[in-house]
Amino acid sequence: MLAQTPRTGCVTIAGMLRTLIAVLAVELIWGADADLILYNGKIVTVDAQFSIQQAVAVKNARIVATGSNEAVLKSQRGPHTRVVDLRGRMALPGLIDSHLHPLEGGLSEFREPLPPLDSYAAIQDYIRRQARRTPKGEWIVVPRTFPTRLKELRMPTREVLDVTPDHPVLFDASYVVVVNTLGLKISGITRDTPSPPHGEILKDERGEPNGILRNAQSLLKGLRPGAAFSEQEKLSALEKMLRMYLEAGLTSVGEGGANLEEIRLYEKLKAEKRLPLRVVITWWVNVGRPLDDLTREIRSAPWTTNEGDDWLKFGAFKVNFDGGMTIGTAYQRQPYGPFGRQLYGKTDPNDRGQLFATPEKYLAVFRAARERGWSLSAHTQGGGAVDLFLETMEALDRERPIAPTRSHLIHASFQSPQAIARMKRLGIAADVQAAWLHCDGPALEKVFGYDGLRYFFPLRSYLDAGVVIAGGSDHMIGYDKNRAINPYNPFHGLWISVTRKTNRGTVLHPEEKVTREEALKTYTIWAAWRQFAEKIKGSIEPGKLADMVVIDRDYLSCPEDDIMRIEPVMVILDGKIVVEKM
C-alpha cells in the first residue's frame, strides 16, 4: 500500500518540492541577475504589437525581460550586471539578410581593392594595369559588373576588350561573360562552334563570334576560377566578409547558394570557432548536370532543411531557373525589345531570355529534394521563370501540400498579380533584394518602359496579397557596404523599400512602397520565418536569442533619406557586445 502524502492546508509537501525544483531550474538557466541590461532607450521589439519598450535584459544569451526602465532594472539588475544607458538611442532586433554571397564577396578584394568599373574606359584601364603584372598567355578577369551599370548602357564585345595582344581577357557579368579575340582563339570558338545546351555563342552581322557567351563559359580553355586561392585564403576571406556584415548590423545571414566545397568551408569555420555571426546555408546544385547525377547527389546528401544549430544550419535547396535581368538572360514573358537588344547585344527580336533546364527536369529535381525534406527555392528573375516555378510548385502541391515547406522564389524581379495570387495560394514566400531596383531600375526602364516595371519588386502588392517577404541584398562583389555589388548595408535596403528611389533620384512606382515598420519586418521577423526561426530570433522578446543592434538615430521618425545613413553603434550577438562604437 502506498503511503499517503502528508498535507499542509491545501498544498502538499510534494507540490511544494516540485515548485521549489522548478524555481531552482529557472535560476540555474537564467540566474538571479541579468548579464546585460540596456535601458533608457527605444527598444523596437517587433513583437505582435510592434511595441516599443524602454529597457531589455539579457541572461545566458537569451532575452529575459523587456519593459520600463524601472521594471527591468528593479527585477533584473544585480551586482555583476553590465548596465548600458542608451541615452535615448534606438535598439532593433538583430538584422537578417536573407540572400547574399559571402565567399564571393570576401575573395573579391582579398588581395587588392577594386576600382569602380562603370565605363568602357575604366574597364580598359583595368585590363592594361593587369596586363603589366600578369604573365603573357594567362587570363585577365575583369571583376563582375553589368551593362546596366555602364555609362554606355551596352554590353561590351570582344573589340572593347582587345587592349592587350598577349592575354586572353574575360569580362564577368555572371551568367554572361565576354571574352576578347585571343580568348576566343585559344578556346577554339569560331563561327562553326555549336552553342552548348541552354547556352549561346552570340555573333556579329558577319556571323563571327562577337565575344558574348550566354551560359556558355564551359567552352573556355585555361580559365581556372578560384584556383588561385588556397583553402586557408578562402577561409580567411569568408571570415573577413562575415565580420563586415556583423559590423554593418547583421547578426544572421542567408548564404545565397553554396556548393559542396563552400559548405565545407562554413563547417570548418564553425569547427574552428571562427564564425562571426549566424549563417543559414542554401544548398545550390547546377541543374545543367545529368539528371541521374543530380538525383543521386540529392538523395545521398548528409543534410536537409533545418539540420544544424543556431549558428550554422541548412535552409533551402536551390536551382537556377534563368539568368539575370541585368544581362538579358532573365526568362521573360515577352521579348526584350529594341533597346534590350542594344543593351544586351542580342540579335534575335524574339529573344525572351534563357531557361537553364526543361520543365520536366525541374520537376524531377525538386521532387527528389522534397522527398529528402528540403524547403525548395529557385533563382527566378524573369516573369516567365516565375511562372514556370509556380507551375512546378503546383504540380508538387497536387501530390502533397507544399505550404509547410516554406518554399520561396529568389528575386522574382518581374511579377504579375496572377503570379502573386498563386504564391499566396501555395504559401510561397518572396526573397527580395531592393538594391536591384535602386541600381538597375533606370536602365531597365529604358528596356521595358515605366509601365513594364509596374510589378518590378512589388513589395506592397506582396503584402496586400498576404505573401511573406524576406529582405536581403544579394551582395556578391566588394567590401564597401554602400558601394558594393550589391550594397549590403541593411539600412540602404530598408531605405529603398520605403522610398523606391533609384540611383538617378527617380521614384519607381511609388504605389509599391511599404511602411518603415513593414520594411523592418522583412529584415527581422519575416526573414526569421523564412528560415524556420521565428520562435528564436527576429524580435526582442523573452526567451529569444539576444541578438540586437543599437543605432545612431531613430529609424521610425528620422527624415526618409536619413534611413540609408543610419549607423550601428552597438551590435549584440548571443548576448555579448561584439561591436561597440558608443
Show the residue positions of the predicted features:
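Divalent metal-binding segments
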Residues: 33-39, 48-299, 306, 311-315, ...
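Short, charged, surface-exposed secondary-structure boundary motifs
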Residues: 289-292, 440-444, 581-582
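Ligand-binding beta-strand-loop-alpha-helix segment within the catalytic cores
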Residues: 429
